[in-house]
Amino acid sequence: MAKYNIGAVVAEFNYDITQMMLGLAKEEAKSRDCEITQVVTVPGVFDMALAIKKLLEKDEIDAVITLGAVIEGATDHDQIVAQHASRKIADLSLEYEKPVALGISGPGMTRLDAHKRVDYGKRAVEAAIKMCDRLNEI
């Protein structure tokens, strides 16, 4: 039995990048005796909040990781998406009293930058597990 069951919400936008992030996240979870038990794919980072909420409502989910890549475009859209998504993600973690780890790279980065940051998937799992451990100590 896994130490912690982790849900993952993964953006389809920049799919090639987010799938690499998910692969690294699954490897990291397994190496730490945890498991990503449910993966929910959403259109983009801005669309994550409802899926995160649904996962947090499940008793069997101990934490949620978010995986996405917000790449800079011709407008400030990437800034708006990242700011609003990260704020809502933090709010959901507080509301449900479960860790929600931010594995979203960007904003203000190029596609090449995003490829260099696929390890955010691994980092999100690390953060989720550390938070579960710390919360269990309280």
UniProtKB/Swiss-Prot annotation:
Pathway participation: Cofactor biosynthesis; riboflavin biosynthesis; riboflavin from 2-hydroxy-3-oxobutyl phosphate and 5-amino-6-(D-ribitylamino)uracil: step 1/2
GO CC terms of this entry = riboflavin synthase complex
Instruction: Tell whether Ribonucleoprotein is among the UniProt keywords.
Output: no
Per the record, what are the reactions this protein catalyses? (2S)-2-hydroxy-3-oxobutyl phosphate + 5-amino-6-(D-ribitylamino)uracil = 6,7-dimethyl-8-(1-D-ribityl)lumazine + phosphate + 2 H2O + H(+)
* Binding residue positions for 5-amino-6-(D-ribitylamino)uracil: 13, 45-47, 69-71, 102
Please tell me where (2S)-2-hydroxy-3-oxobutyl phosphate binds in this chain: 74-75, 117
- Matching InterPro entries: LS (IPR034964), LS/RS (IPR002180), LS/RS_sf (IPR036467)
Q: Where is the active site?
A: 77 (proton donor)
What Enzyme Commission number(s) appear in the record?
A: 2.5.1.78
Q: Name one GO molecular function term.
A: 6,7-dimethyl-8-ribityllumazine synthase activity
Pfam family of the protein (one) = DMRL_synthase
GO biological process annotation, one example: riboflavin biosynthetic process
> Sorted alphabetically, which keywords does the UniProt record give?
Riboflavin biosynthesis, Transferase
Report the PANTHER family cross-referenced here: 6,7-DIMETHYL-8-RIBITYLLUMAZINE SYNTHASE (PTHR21058:SF0), 6,7-DIMETHYL-8-RIBITYLLUMAZINE SYNTHASE DMRL SYNTHASE LUMAZINE SYNTHASE (PTHR21058)
**NCBIfam families listed in its UniProt record:** lumazine-synth (TIGR00114)
Q: Which family does it belong to?
A: Belongs to the DMRL synthase family.
HAMAP family recorded: Lumazine_synth
The record describes the protein's role as: Catalyzes the formation of 6,7-dimethyl-8-ribityllumazine by condensation of 5-amino-6-(D-ribitylamino)uracil with 3,4-dihydroxy-2-butanone 4-phosphate. This is the penultimate step in the biosynthesis of riboflavin.
The protein in question is named 6,7-dimethyl-8-ribityllumazine synthase
Q: What species is this protein from?
A: Methanobrevibacter smithii (strain ATCC 35061 / DSM 861 / OCM 144 / PS)
